[in-house]
Every structure is written in C-alpha cells, then in structure tokens.
C-alpha cells in the first residue's frame, strides 16, 4: 500500500518515519521547522525535514516534505522557500509518484531517498 499511495493518516506517519530512517541511515542529521501562528493558535507552516550541507563558507539548507498520498499541497514548502530564499540549496518532496522537477522543487519517489 505504501507504493500505491493508499495510506490512512496513521500510516502516513509510518511513511514519514520510514523516510526519516532512510535519511539517518544515509548519514544525515535531521532537523525540522514549524512556525506557530499566535492569531490562529496553530502551526501554519511545517517542514518535515531539513538537511544541511555543513559548509562553513556556503552554508545551505535543503527542506524536505514527505507526502504519502497522490494528492497533496506544498504550501508550507513554498512559503518556507520564500522566507529563507538566500539559504536554500534545493527543495525536495518525497512522494509516491515518479521523479520530476517543477518550479525548482525536486519530486522524488520514496525509493530514491538514498540519493539525498
């Protein structure tokens, strides 16, 4: 079911944890980002994972959103990219579809997570 994109909410969390494990196994330190909106009393932006190139001279970050379904929104990723434009080295969405690149965002199937 993971590969077919037929996951429930709880299984979606499982999917995200599998991706986290793959990133850690590849040697990455994992970071995340949330922004709390005081007026709405909720998080209005959340990035699942942020990787870093650890360069002292040209430090860049790489936000990653994990999507377990075929239909999804990347509003948080788009807003994050706008807010931190100077620091972004590349943006990724890990999803159940094929590899593609649209508007500067690389969309990777889950099995290609090791490429990051």
Spans of model-derived segments:
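A cross-kingdom feature that marks ATP-driven nucleic-acid transaction machinery
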Residues: 1-116
């Amino acid at each position: 079911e993971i590969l077919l994109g037929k996951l429930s909410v709880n299984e979606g969390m499982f999917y995200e944890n599998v991706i986290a494990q793959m990133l850690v196994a590849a040697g990455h330190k994992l970071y995340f980002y949330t922004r709390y909106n005081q007026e709405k009393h909720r998080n209005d932006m959340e990035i699942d994972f942020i990787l870093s190139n650890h360069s002292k001279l040209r430090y860049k970050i790489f936000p990653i959103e994990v999507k377990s379904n075929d239909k999804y929104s990347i509003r948080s990723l788009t807003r994050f990219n706008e807010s931190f434009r100077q620091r972004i080295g590349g943006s990724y969405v890990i999803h159940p579809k094929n590899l593609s690149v649209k508007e500067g965002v690389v969309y990777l199937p889950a099995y290609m997570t090791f490429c990051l």
